[in-house]
Amino acid sequence: MSRSTKDRCMRYWTAALLGLALAASPVAAKTKPVPVEGQTPQPAIETGNYPYQLFVPKGYLTDTAKQYPLLVFLHGSGERGDDVAKVKVHGPPKIAERDPAFPFLTVSPLLGTDQDWDIDKLDRMIDHIAKTYRIDPTRVYLTGLSRGGHASWRWAIAEPKRFAAVAAVAGRGNPGEACRLMDLPVWAFHGDRDDVVMPEGSFAMARAIRACGGRKVRLTIYPDLGHNAWDPAYDDPALYAWLLEQKLPSPTITNKDKK
């Protein structure tokens, strides 16, 4: 073999080995696909966790210095199953589907049939989102309707410093633990003729928070309305304006390796 041929072979194998080394390196392992603006279905972040709809606001790809508020939406019993598109029939994902300028990066997980919301799974999902996208860690919001409203109360009670504000729609919480929410901005919504989740569920939580000295709780009761308090609640721009006014005094989620 001539010297020039040997040199070419050496360069070839050097380049090949370098490519393999880079592919196995931590830098390559952290490479992530570029996010897509708009609303897209996403697989579960781990086995046993929830698939979800992810909404990325218009402008996310061009304004790369901007951090976005994160809104977590928990649906009700009627949307459970294996079709993640069903989470878009109500609430923030419905709004985001028709408005690309909806200002929140929105995560809407899907419960499987006969499942209930698991806070540990939700925590891991939100930690993943916060580390992956440009989230403002002082503006993380939670909302849910019916079964998702129950879970919103429960999650907020378990971690009252995780969220800047919570909006619980047609849900009920545990008044015995309401004092944990005395410093958290909360807005509860209910129809006064709800015979699925009685409006007393929201009344009791608001009373209990106020009895503890909480002054950041709001309660909206819709007259002559049944269980569907979510349409008027989520269609009201005042809700989203109120959410955006609330901020945590310090971050409670990490924000590394963001896309």
Per-segment meaning from a language model:
Residues 70, 74-124:
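Active-site machinery of serine-nucleophile hydrolases
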Residues 26-70, 150, 155, 167, ...:
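A domain-start/cap signature at the N-terminus of enzymes
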Residues 138-182:
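Primarily recognizes the serine-hydrolase "nucleophile elbow" in alpha/beta-hydrolase
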Residues 235-255:
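Catalytic active-site module of serine/aspartate enzymes centered on a nucleophile-bearing elbow/loop
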Residues 59-66, 114-146:
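Gly/Ser-rich "nucleophile elbow"/oxyanion-hole loop immediately N-terminal to the catalytic nucleophile
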Residues 196-201:
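Conserved alpha/beta-hydrolase "acid-adjacent" motif
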Residues 226-233:
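Catalytic histidine-centered segment of alpha/beta-hydrolase-like enzymes
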Residues 188-190, 194:
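Short beta-strand/loop motif that positions the catalytic acidic residue
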